[in-house]
Design a protein with these regions (language model features):
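Hydrophobic transmembrane alpha-helix bundles
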Residues: 29-36, 123-131
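Alpha-helix N-cap/loop-to-helix initiation residues
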Residues: 24, 117-118
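Catalytic-core segments of class I nucleotidyltransferases/pyrophosphorylases
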Residues: 7, 42-117, 123-124, 130
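Conserved beta-loop-beta/alpha segment of the NTase-like Rossmann-fold superfamily
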Residues: 1-37
Length: 131
C-alpha cells in the first residue's frame, strides 16, 4: 500500500521489492534474486541467481523492482558494481547493485508485495493466462 511504501522509503536508502510463498520459485530458484534479512528485518545480503536457503518459498525473492531515496545512491553503486566487475553469467544485474549498497552501509529494506505473477518463461505466462 502507498502509505507503507512512502514510510519505508523515507526511513531507508533503498527498497528491494520482494515476494514470498509463490510456487514458481520452487521449480527454478536460480531464476531469481534473493534477499537475506537480519534480525530487525533489514536486508543484510542480496544474492543473484543463487538461493539463500533450502526453503526458497519462505525467502524474500526479488520482483526485479527497486526504489532509491536518492538517485545519487543508485548511480554511485552502479558504478561500484561495474568497477568491481560483479557480473553474473557475464551480465550486470541490478540485484548486485543492491548488494553493493548493503556492503557500502546503506539502509536497504525489503518492500514485500502481496502477489507476484512471474512471466519469466513461456510456461509461466501460459499458467497465468489460465487463471
Amino acid at each position: 500500500d502507498k502509505t507503507n511504501y512512502n514510510k519505508k522509503l523515507i526511513t531507508s536508502d533503498a527498497l528491494v521489492w520482494t515476494f514470498r510463498n509463490n510456487k514458481s520459485v520452487v521449480k527454478n530458484p536460480e531464476m531469481y534474486g534473493w534477499t537475506k534479512l537480519d534480525k530487525v528485518g533489514q536486508v543484510s545480503r542480496v544474492s543473484c541467481k543463487v538461493p539463500i536457503s533450502d526453503t526458497p518459498i519462505k525467502d524474500h525473492a526479488i520482483t526485479g523492482s527497486f526504489s532509491f531515496r536518492k538517485a545519487e545512491h543508485f548511480l554511485e553503486y552502479c558504478d561500484k558494481t561495474i568497477f568491481k566487475n560483479r557480473r553474473i553469467n557475464n551480465e550486470f544485474y541490478l540485484d548486485i547493485v543492491l548488494d553493493e549498497c548493503v556492503i557500502g552501509g546503506l539502509n536497504v529494506q525489503p518492500f514485500e508485495v502481496d502477489e507476484y505473477n512471474s512471466w519469466g518463461t513461456p510456461l509461466d505466462l501460459e499458467n497465468y493466462l489460465k487463471k
